[in-house]
């Protein structure tokens, strides 16, 4: 049954539409984004164009020209992408082929798989008579000489290889592979006995069979399946290799309806090996006799114009890693497109010429943290000054004293501090007794300071008798005389009346009380309590009370001892002033004349403690700093207007003047009267504190700790 022209046109359009749908597959090129990836978009477009031309060369009966039949075929050509490394024009030497054309120009280049038997190209589901009639009506007939040559060559079994029937599955399609070690299946394509002698000389690696995933078409769509299968079968018979997704290292779970295979036009080795690319990376797994892959532009210069309305298949982003067996294929792409290689470390490496152990960023001392930077600055300052700073210790009160005291009698006590030659008057001792005495330690401080508490205690004495009394005395027990206070303390104190000791760890205090007042409660330990009922028992230390103290530590600073504070209160007051000196009090726009401004200039000002800082009006760049510690007066311009006018001075209703101790002055005026009043009230409120801020020891201390 002959097909009409409209049916033929419709059938051709359906065939091309199926080809376009088949081309929408994940690309074997490992690419991400064409604009910023390692592979240029031109290669992908050339690959699609080449694949379209290869399909367009096949007629309805799926007869396509062999890649090995072209004059430009080189040794190991597998990719039609490389246009720069080819030495000959690609398509000019071939005769122009129309779609569904079977006329092919034969070249002298020898190819084993250059012909296919007419019986192997038939399709069982398609009527052979319809196909032949369609070819007779649409295509150019072969000449008599070429037809006779073709029939003679096809009848020779040594020069042709019959492909499998077109209705077999893709898993049975035999495919010649470049490297059999990398093939999925290493079964031979045909028996070695049927090979010609010429083929044994040319071919190095034996052809193998590649198992391909099946299509996901419906069972009812037989026309498309049979046409594609017959086309693939004929291409195999002509030496056209099939490149699948699996062959490039992709998993089978990524195959779908679009997993139609595109022919990359494989060829066997050629005698002309000087055109082979030698700059491609050779893997160690490649055999020594295997030649590297080369490129050909056989189908790039085709005059055939693709349909502009046809959708161009996009290459999606490939997230899986490539198969390491095809490293040479990926290296070929790198050699074509890569211009530079960027390597970036994901870890930070710290290099040093000194061998030292890594220390933690914080050091724990009695559950109190001290920044390591401050600790280093403190240790360096101690080495430079050769001192240990100043330690303030204030004894506040004695709490919860448990030693027995005589009722109705006053027990007095005193204390001594190691390293201090002090004489403390006797004071009354109770269970809670206030002391409130402060002491400073300027010289080198030992690791601990011991405070010893001592009570007024008289040990018992034996009454002695005269000589005459001894003669006339009886054998009575000698009596002892003691006062009630000493009698109550007997057995709880030492012979000199010491009833407790308090130990202050200076190493701990120097870190916990650095630059601040630290309140501590320390135990009072007694080492002289003895049980009267027990005999020859060594006394054990026991807690008999608590002592509350306040400590404050200043590190060694490059200032004289006279400049250091004399007490904890003065040190805390100076530090509060230093903290206030860093506080923002007022800000806004003012016009200034004087100082660094010989004429009126509008600036943005900030009153930070005792400093009036000027910034640029727009960029807010710091321009000048006015120290108000030497300022003595803040004068309103309205006050000057009532008195004698100054020569050359311009008075403003919203202006004021700052006068310094050396007679200099700077004039300001605000944008409104309300802003002027706010500035003047803030300046007058804090002007008295500005003169007390600048202490040398606070500057030195803050430079160490902040």
Swiss-Prot record:
Cellular compartments annotated: Cytoplasm, Cell cortex; Cytoplasm, Cytoskeleton
Molecular-function annotations in GO: GTP binding; phosphatidylinositol-4,5-bisphosphate binding
Region of interest (Disordered), residue spans: 62-102, 145-180
Induction: Cell cycle-regulated with a peak during septation (at protein level). Induced by transcription factor ace2 during mitosis. Degraded via SCF-dependent proteolysis.
Pfam families on file: PH
Protein name: Septin ring organizing protein mid2
Role, per record: Responsible for the proper stability and function of septins during cytokinesis. Required for the correct formation of the medial septin ring structure in mitosis and for the proper localization of endo-glucanases agn1 and eng1, which are needed for efficient cell separation. May act as a landmark for the localization of hydrolytic proteins to the medial region.
């Amino acid at each position: 049954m002959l097909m009409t022209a409209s049916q033929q046109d419709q059938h051709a359009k359906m065939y091309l539409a199926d080809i376009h749908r088949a081309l929408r597959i994940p690309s074997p090129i490992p690419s991400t984004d064409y604009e910023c990836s390692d592979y240029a978009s031109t290669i992908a477009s050339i690959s699609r164009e080449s694949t379209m031309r290869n399909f367009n060369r096949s007629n309805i009966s799926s007869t396509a020209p062999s890649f090995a039949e072209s004059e430009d075929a080189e040794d190991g050509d597998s990719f039609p992408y490389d246009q720069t490394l080819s030495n000959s024009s690609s398509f000019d030497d071939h005769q122009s082929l129309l779609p569904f054309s079977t006329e092919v120009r034969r070249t002298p280049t020898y190819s084993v798989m250059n012909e296919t038997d007419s019986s192997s190209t038939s399709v069982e589901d398609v009527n052979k008579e319809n196909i032949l009639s369609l070819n007779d009506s649409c295509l150019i007939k072969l000449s008599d000489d070429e037809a006779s040559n073709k029939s003679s060559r096809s009848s020779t079994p040594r020069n042709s290889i019959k492909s499998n029937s077109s209705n077999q599955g893709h898993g049975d399609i035999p495919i010649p592979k470049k490297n059999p070690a990398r093939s999925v299946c290493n079964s031979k394509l045909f028996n070695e006995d049927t090979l010609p002698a010429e083929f044994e000389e040319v071919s190095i690696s034996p052809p193998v069979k590649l198992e391909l995933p099946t299509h996901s078409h419906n069972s009812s769509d037989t026309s498309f399946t049979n046409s594609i299968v017959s086309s693939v079968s004929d291409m195999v018979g002509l030496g056209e290799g099939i490149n699948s997704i699996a062959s490039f290292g992709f998993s089978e779970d990524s195959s779908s309806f679009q997993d139609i295979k595109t022919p990359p036009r494989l060829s066997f080795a050629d005698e002309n090996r000087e055109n082979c690319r030698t700059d491609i990376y050779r893997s160690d797994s490649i055999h020594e006799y295997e030649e590297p892959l080369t490129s050909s532009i056989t189908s790039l210069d085709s005059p055939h114009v693709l349909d502009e309305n046809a959708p161009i298949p996009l290459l999606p982003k490939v997230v899986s890693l490539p198969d390491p067996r095809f490293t040479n294929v990926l290296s070929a792409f790198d050699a074509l497109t890569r211009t530079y290689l960027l390597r970036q470390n994901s870890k930070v490496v710290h290099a040093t010429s000194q061998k030292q152990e890594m220390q933690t960023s914080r050091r724990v001392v009695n559950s109190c943290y001290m920044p390591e930077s401050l600790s280093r600055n403190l240790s360096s300052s101690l080495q430079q000054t050769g001192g240990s700073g100043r330690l303030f210790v204030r004894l506040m009160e004695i709490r919860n004293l448990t030693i027995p005291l005589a009722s109705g009698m006053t027990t007095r006590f005193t204390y001594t501090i190691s390293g201090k030659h002090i004489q403390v008057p006797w004071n009354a001792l109770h269970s809670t007794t206030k002391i409130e005495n402060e002491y400073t330690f300027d010289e080198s401080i030992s690791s601990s300071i011991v405070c010893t508490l001592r009570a007024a205690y008289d040990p018992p004495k034996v009454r002695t008798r005269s000589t005459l009394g001894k003669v006339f005395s009886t054998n009575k027990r000698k009596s002892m005389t003691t006062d009630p206070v000493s009698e109550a303390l007997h057995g709880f104190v030492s012979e000199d009346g010491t009833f407790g000791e308090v130990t202050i760890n200076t190493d701990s205090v120097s870190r916990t009380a650095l630059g601040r007042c630290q309140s501590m409660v320390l135990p009072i330990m007694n080492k002289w309590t003895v049980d009267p009922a027990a005999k020859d028992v060594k006394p054990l230390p026991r807690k008999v009370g608590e002592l509350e103290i306040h400590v404050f530590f200043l590190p060694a600073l490059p200032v004289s001892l006279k400049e250091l504070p004399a007490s904890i209160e003065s040190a805390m007051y100076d530090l509060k002033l230093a903290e206030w000196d860093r506080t923002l009090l007022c800000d806004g726009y003012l016009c200034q004349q004087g100082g660094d401004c010989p004429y009126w200039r509008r600036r943005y000002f900030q009153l930070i403690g005792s400093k009036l800082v000027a910034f640029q009006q727009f960029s807010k760049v710091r321009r000048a700093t006015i120290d108000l510690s030497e300022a003595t007066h803040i004068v309103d311009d309205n006050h000057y207007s009532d008195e004698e006018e100054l020569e050359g001075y311009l008075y403003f209703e919203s202006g004021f003047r700052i006068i310094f101790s050396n007679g200099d002055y700077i004039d300001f005026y605000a944008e409104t009267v309300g802003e002027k009043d706010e500035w003047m009230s803030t300046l007058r409120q804090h002007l008295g504190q500005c003169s007390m801020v600048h202490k040398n020891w606070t500057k030195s201390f803050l430079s160490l700790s902040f």
